[in-house]
Every structure is written in C-alpha cells, then in structure tokens.
Amino acid sequence: MRPNDRAADQVRPIKITRNYTAYAEGSVLVEFGNTKVLCNATVEESVPRWLKGQGKGWVTAEYGMLPRATHSRTRREAANGKQGGRTMEIQRLIARSLRAVVDLEAMGEFMITVDCDVIQADGGTRTASISGASVAMADAFQHLVDSGKLKANPMKGHVAAVSVGILGEDVLCDLEYVEDSAADTDMNVVMTEEGKMIEIQGTAEGEPFSHEQLLALLESAKKGISEIVAAQKAALAN
C-alpha cells in the first residue's frame, strides 16, 4: 500500500500558487505532496553573447536545495565553492525542457532565467521544478506581452514532468522519497502537453526491467503528466 493510500497511477496532491514573490516576472510555489519548490522566472532584455544580433531569445534555469530541505542539513554548495554534478545535471534538464516548448525566434532578444529552489524535498524535486517552472515562465512571457514588449506569448504549450518507478511488481507514478529509495527502477519522464517526449531518464537500480515494463512506465507517466498539465492550466486560468 502506498503512502496516503494512493493508487499506483495516481500523482500526489498538486498545488500551484502563482505570484508567490513580489519581484520576479513569474513566481510560482509548486507543491507535490510534501515536495515544495519555489520557481522564479526573471526577464532580462539581453541574450548570451553568442546569440547577440540573431533576433532570437534564450531560456535557461538554475536549481538548488535549501540546507534543510531534507531530513538532515546539507551544506550550501556556495560554501563549497562549486556546484555539484547532480545540481548541474538537473538545471540543464530543466532548461532543455523549457526551451522545448518555446519559439525562441518569436521571443526576440530576451532571456528568461528560471530559478528553482527546493524548499522541502520528498522525492521528485527535478520533475516538480520543471512543472512549476513552466507556469512561472508562462507568467513571465505574459508580462512581456502585457508590457507591449512582445506581440504574443511564444510558448507553444506546457511542459510537465513526473517520476515513475517499479517497486516489487508494481509500476508507481510520482514517487515519494520512501518509494524512490526502495524502487528497483527509477525513471523521470518529461513531456509536452500533447504527450510528446522531451526526455526520459531511467535506471534499473536493482532488477533489470523488461520492454513491457518500460511501456507500462511510460503509459503511467503519460497519465500523470496529463493530470499535471490540467493543474497548470487551472492555475493559469485563475
């Protein structure tokens, strides 16, 4: 039995709070159960040097965890003088996922940076970051439209992500930490709102998984992501 008696293919309760902070052009607190991530999207009227003069924009991301986001305190990466490999991998994943749903040429020479800060971690922090960042980015683009700097929102749709895994004989969706740490297979899936794949990260931690199990994992992820996209759209409609 899963925590909180969730069904195997059921995502955790999702809460998306927009305009969470006062200064960012897009600010979202996203909650998946006990996992909470603050996603702030900042607009800059400039692009990286290698893009200057091309009439294209750029979307990038940064990711971090507060020291007590987990059960025991983790030393700040700034205190260590460098980012860890996991952090760099995750923020690149977030950025790639966001760019996949943006028409960079239509956004002009603007850059959006989405900072994803994990306030509390209970599994699925990277997937929650992507799902929250999509909403924050949508608000940042709408800010550019409302201010007359863009004619239309250059987002082609929403992007969302979820973790899936195999625990025993069960395919589970949106794993909490206690499930993730015990899973035989752990997979992160990123999709567009149309169900097109952006990224699949899957590893057999214990027993190898079959082709049939892979398809079951992807089907579970697709269902979960459709629920997340519905929550994103509902949040933006308010």
From Swiss-Prot:
**Keywords of the record:** Nucleotidyltransferase, RNA-binding, rRNA processing, Transferase, tRNA processing, tRNA-binding
What GO biological process terms does the UniProt entry carry, in alphabetical order?
rRNA catabolic process; rRNA processing; tRNA processing
Name the chemical reaction catalysed here.
Answer: tRNA(n+1) + phosphate = tRNA(n) + a ribonucleoside 5'-diphosphate
GO molecular function terms noted in the UniProt entry: 3'-5'-RNA exonuclease activity; tRNA binding; tRNA nucleotidyltransferase activity
Q: Does the keyword Mitochondrion apply?
A: no
Stated EC number for the protein is 2.7.7.56
Question: One Pfam family, short name please?
Answer: RNase_PH
Summarize where phosphate binds, as residue positions. R86, G124, T125, R126
Q: Does the keyword Ion transport apply?
A: no
PANTHER family reported in the protein's UniProt record:
EXOSOME COMPLEX COMPONENT, EXOSOME COMPLEX COMPONENT RRP41
What the record says about family reads: Belongs to the RNase PH family.
- State what this protein does: Phosphorolytic 3'-5' exoribonuclease that plays an important role in tRNA 3'-end maturation. Removes nucleotide residues following the 3'-CCA terminus of tRNAs; can also add nucleotides to the ends of RNA molecules by using nucleoside diphosphates as substrates, but this may not be physiologically important. Probably plays a role in initiation of 16S rRNA degradation (leading to ribosome degradation) during starvation.
State how it assembles: Homohexameric ring arranged as a trimer of dimers.
Under which name does UniProt file this protein?
Answer: Ribonuclease PH
Q: Which organism is it from?
A: Vibrio vulnificus (strain YJ016)
Q: Which gene encodes it?
A: rph
